[in-house]
Design a protein with these regions (language model features):
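Conserved alpha/beta-domain cores
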Residues: 1-278
Length: 278
């Protein structure tokens, strides 16, 4: 579950809410929205992705004029770097309070969190410290995932996996950063540069899946790839992805595709085993 729509609905910058003594607005609105979804799917887990507004998006909120103007907000002050910054930490703490309220006051312990756009292991460790100070301590009933969308996470996949309970591969941002391609560039898109099926991107995804499983954590993927390309979805199944998000209109088709791939894998394994016995 993404939280950006909650921020858009409130329409006010979190730090401006704090400065005007209205921090409870974010806590209450966010906790109410999360509670509605968490109750509907209980006891299945609801993984809430903490805010991932970029500076240009925050500037569009009331009180957002405090945001710096960045030339490239996509790789700017967002995600984990924002949470641990003295200029925004108190805003992140409001989000933590909302999560704690959902879990404590409503008993919805199926609510977990996911940290977007993390870049370093020390950043993750610091975010976890802040969360723990707000009563959100990582344990068997409260899991912390990260979005794996920055190449640094790929290069240190096992180290990151040792800090969290799950990876969610953000294939859109990962493709941009691995390939050095702006996905909004019509020229490069038309030339075929933005493609999650590129061998470099697939190698990065493979590394993340295998590192996650080596450390005993789950690995999922979100992005357009599995919905658009059946061969890409098949690749993910072969590599052992635990789950994938797809567009609503492709859910039934993708389920059949995954079932078919898994059946072929089982039959292939059985034939191989029978051949060894002979």
């Amino acid at each position: 579950m993404r939280t950006e729509f909650i921020f858009s609905h409130i329409g006010v910058h979190p730090m401006y809410l704090l400065r005007t003594g209205r921090g409870e607005v974010l806590i209450n609105d966010m906790s109410q929205a999360i509670t509605t979804v968490a109750q509907a799917i209980y006891p299945r887990p609801l993984v809430v992705r903490m805010s991932d507004f970029r500076t240009n998006e925050f500037r569009g909120l009331e009180g957002g004029e405090v945001e710096p103007e960045e030339n490239n907000p996509m790789i700017g002050w967002r995600g984990g770097s924002r949470y641990i910054s003295p200029a925004y930490e108190e805003g992140f703490r409001l989000e933590c309070k909302a999560i704690k309220k959902v879990r404590d006051e409503f008993g919805l312990i199926n609510v977990w969190v996911m940290l977007p756009f993390v870049r370093t292991t020390w950043e993750v460790a610091r975010v976890k410290e802040i969360m723990a100070s707000e009563g959100l301590v990582q344990n068997k009933s409260f899991k912390i995932w990260i979005m794996a969308e920055v190449p640094a996470v790929v290069f240190q996949a096992e180290e990151f996996a040792g800090l969290v309970d799950g990876f969610s591969i953000g294939s859109n941002d990962l493709t941009q950063l691995v390939m050095g391609v702006d996905r909004d560039s019509g020229i490069l898109n038309n030339m075929g540069y933005f493609d999650e099926r590129d061998p470099s991107v697939k190698n990065a995804i493979k590394t993340l899946i295998h590192a996650a499983h080596k450390q005993g954590i789950t690995c999922s993927i979100c992005g357009q790839g599995p919905s658009l390309y059946p061969d890409f979805a098949e690749f993910l199944v072969h590599e052992g992805i635990d789950s994938m998000s797809v567009n609503p209109d492709t859910v039934a088709y993708t389920r059949r595709l995954v079932a078919g791939v898994e059946q072929r894998m089982i039959l292939g394994g059985m034939r191989k085993l029978m051949g060894q016995e002979l």
